[in-house]
């Protein structure tokens, strides 16, 4: 049986979220930054542990605020489909403090607008541009501790430029989404467990 998962990728301008997606799908990277101005949909099929998953990856342009309801979601063409995904990937640039603040704000808004009684939607925080480690503005341990211990989210650092931890990111994403119904196991713990197992490949 093929599972279908919708995933939203969000982040401030220039953090490299589209580069992450394209590196994952096409194994390519461009030094030229082309801002995302409209929602882009990618439909890859991924095999993990012998199971096929159809992904609907929604790459969104930077949004000023997360839509508080369905009416607001569909009133803005850039936000359509944002509230009905199975997981969120929130990307920031490890060399840009403002991009982390953006992720912090969007995450909080996602939690505040979540419909009461609905199941937990996994949120994974991604620190991109790991290849620019010397320009890091927040120590990795500080961010990791905040995200995993306080926010209870998964955390991965990657480099879209060098394809470092890109496949790992999406492998753990699939695992987290698949375990989202395990209500008695914390999301962050599920994610960390996934880091030690499972492999995926694009068809």
From Swiss-Prot:
Its EC number is 3.6.5.2. Signal peptide: none annotated. Expressed at high levels in skeletal muscle and, at much lower levels, in heart, brain and pancreas. InterPro entries: P-loop_NTPase, Ras-like_GTPase_Reg, Small_GTPase. It is found in: Cell membrane. Keywords: Cell membrane, GTP-binding, Hydrolase, Lipoprotein, Membrane, Methylation, Nucleotide-binding, Prenylation. This is Ras-like protein family member 10B. It comes from Homo sapiens (Human).
């Amino acid at each position: 049986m093929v599972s279908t998962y919708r995933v939203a990728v969000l982040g401030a301008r220039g953090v490299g979220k589209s580069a992450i997606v394209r590196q994952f799908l096409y194994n390519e990277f461009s030094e030229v930054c082309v801002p995302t101005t409209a929602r882009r949909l990618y439909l890859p099929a991924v095999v993990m542990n012998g199971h096929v998953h159809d992904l609907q990856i929604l790459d969104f342009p930077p949004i000023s605020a997360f839509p508080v309801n369905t009416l607001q979601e569909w009133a803005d063409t850039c936000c359509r489909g944002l509230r009905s995904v199975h997981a969120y990937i929130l990307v920031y640039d490890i060399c840009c403090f403002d991009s982390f603040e953006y992720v912090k704000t969007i995450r909080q808004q996602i939690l505040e607008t979540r419909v009461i009684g609905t199941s937990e939607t996994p949120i994974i925080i991604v620190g991109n541009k790991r290849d620019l480690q010397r320009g890091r503005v927040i120590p990795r341990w500080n961010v990791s501790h905040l995200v995993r211990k306080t926010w209870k989210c998964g955390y991965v650092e990657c480099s879209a430029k060098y394809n470092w931890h890109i496949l790992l990111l999406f492998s753990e994403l699939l695992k987290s989404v698949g375990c989202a119904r395990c209500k008695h196991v914390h999301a962050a713990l599920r994610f960390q467990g996934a880091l030690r197992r499972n492999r995926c490949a694009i068809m």
